């Protein structure tokens, strides 16, 4: 099977994203190829479910290539993306004796990847880590770009660091075991790339035959949307690694989405489901401000719904919405900034949105 290779070009610490069917069986060989010697200790961080599915396979391959590796599982779910899980990883790192020459591997979805990345950024002031994402959302979004974090009771991803992985290894075969709801949630991030930067991807996703292939996990279609999504993200991240400018457009739908995740209770809505509703709200505001046409807004809404994702805003107290938004990482000098579409495949950053223009979408 052909191996897709995407470079994330940065001023320091550029790295590869490798996409290949069956790659989970060859991670040891890939580590050696990128210069990681087998004398380095490895701690694989996963959760019980993912570890049961893929952990033993990965561990056996690493040991076949003479790596000294062990697996440690954290609890699954957004509610465990916290300091407790981070501390558990630190305890495991201490027990197995990870030093500055050691390696962490994140095997799992976005939560495992974010927490493991933050552990790598802070253990002994920084050790290398590898991302092996096993969900669509983590493949196309969170595993690439170096954002690592844990949640705080006051908000999502408030404590973290920009810390790039040594490499990202993606095996689309791992999606076969992914629950349908989680796969569809991952499609929200793919749709996002179509709206913010890649009109051709948006149109590809609109095609009914393509949609059926994607939802039926047809390999060629999966690799195509993963490839296009990561290329878009790599292009943006290479231009603005630490989100001082254009990288903020990757947060399209996320300000409102994070409000929904937080106020409805983490886990009530999956991240991608909340982002879908956030994109719907952003699209409606853009239409109201004559930034893009009603037709484009309706096309976006239809595309979101066609992949089984929600667009209906849940009932939330308006006062609570403002508290969460003012704690958003995109706030600058006390002003909220919103990513709004101005065309299919193009968005911009606005800080002149009145409260009344978005609070009305929350009951």
From Swiss-Prot:
This is 3-dehydroquinate synthase. Pathway: Metabolic intermediate biosynthesis; chorismate biosynthesis; chorismate from D-erythrose 4-phosphate and phosphoenolpyruvate: step 2/7. Its cofactor is NAD(+); Co(2+); Zn(2+). It catalyses: 7-phospho-2-dehydro-3-deoxy-D-arabino-heptonate = 3-dehydroquinate + phosphate. It is an enzyme of class 4 (lyase). Belongs to the sugar phosphate cyclases superfamily. Dehydroquinate synthase family. GO terms for molecular function: 3-dehydroquinate synthase activity; metal ion binding; nucleotide binding. Zn(2+) binds at residues 189, 254, 271. It is found in: Cytoplasm. CDD domains: DHQS. The gene is aroB. Binds 1 divalent metal cation per subunit. Can use either Co(2+) or Zn(2+). It comes from the Bacteria. Keywords: Amino-acid biosynthesis, Aromatic amino acid biosynthesis, Cobalt, Cytoplasm, Lyase, Metal-binding, NAD, Nucleotide-binding, Zinc. Its EC number is 4.2.3.4. Catalyzes the conversion of 3-deoxy-D-arabino-heptulosonate 7-phosphate (DAHP) to dehydroquinate (DHQ). Signal peptide: none annotated. Its main location: cytoplasm. NAD(+) binds at residues 134-135, 147, 156, 174-177. Gene3D superfamilies: 3.40.50.1970, Dehydroquinate synthase-like - alpha domain. SUPFAM superfamilies: Dehydroquinate synthase-like. One of its GO terms (cellular component) is cytoplasm. PANTHER family: 3-DEHYDROQUINATE SYNTHASE, 3-DEHYDROQUINATE SYNTHASE, CHLOROPLASTIC. GO terms for biological process: amino acid biosynthetic process; aromatic amino acid family biosynthetic process; chorismate biosynthetic process. InterPro entries: Dehydroquinate_synthase, DHQ_synth_AroB, DHQ_synth_fam, DHQS/DOIS_N, DHQS_C.
């Amino acid at each position: 099977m052909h191996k897709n290779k995407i470079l994330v070009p940065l001023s320091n610490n550029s790295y590869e994203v490798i996409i290949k069917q069956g790659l989970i069986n060859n991670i040891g060989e890939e580590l050696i190829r990128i210069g990681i010697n087998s004398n380095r200790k490895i701690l694989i961080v996963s959760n019980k479910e993912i570890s049961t599915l893929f952990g033993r396979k990965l561990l056996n391959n690493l040991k076949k290539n003479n790596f000294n590796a062990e697996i440690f599982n954290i609890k699954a779910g957004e509610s465990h993306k916290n300091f407790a899980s981070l501390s558990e990883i630190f305890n495991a790192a201490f027990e197995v004796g990870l030093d500055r020459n050691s390696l962490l591997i994140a095997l799992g979805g976005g939560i495992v990847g974010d927490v493991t990345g933050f552990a790598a950024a802070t253990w002994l002031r920084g050790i290398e880590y590898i991302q092996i994402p096993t969900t669509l959302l983590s493949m196309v979004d969170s595993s690439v770009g170096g954002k690592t974090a844990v949640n705080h009771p006051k908000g999502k991803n408030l404590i973290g660091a920009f810390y790039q992985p040594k490499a990202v290894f993606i095996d689309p075969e791992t999606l076969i075991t992914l629950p349908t709801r989680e796969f569809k949630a991952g499609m929200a991030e793919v749709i996002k790339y179509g709206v913010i930067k890649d009109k051709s991807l948006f149109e590809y996703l609109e095609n009914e035959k393509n949609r059926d292939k994607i939802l039926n996990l047809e390999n060629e279609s999966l690799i195509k949307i993963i490839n296009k999504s990561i290329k878009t993200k790599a292009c943006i991240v290479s231009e603005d690694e630490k989100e001082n400018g254009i990288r903020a457009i990757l947060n399209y739908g996320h300000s409102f989405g994070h409000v929904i995740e937080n106020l409805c209770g983490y886990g009530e809505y999956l991240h991608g489901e909340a982002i879908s509703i956030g994109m719907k709200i952003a699209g409606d505001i853009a239409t109201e401000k004559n930034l893009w046409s009603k037709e484009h807004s309706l096309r976006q809404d239809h595309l979101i719904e066609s992949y089984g994702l929600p667009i209906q805003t849940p009932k939330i107290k308006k006062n609570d919405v403002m508290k969460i938004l003012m704690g958003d990482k995109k706030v600058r000098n006390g002003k909220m900034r919103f990513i709004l579409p101005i065309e299919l495949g193009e968005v911009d950053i606005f800080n002149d949105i009145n409260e009344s223009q978005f609070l009305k979408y929350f009951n």
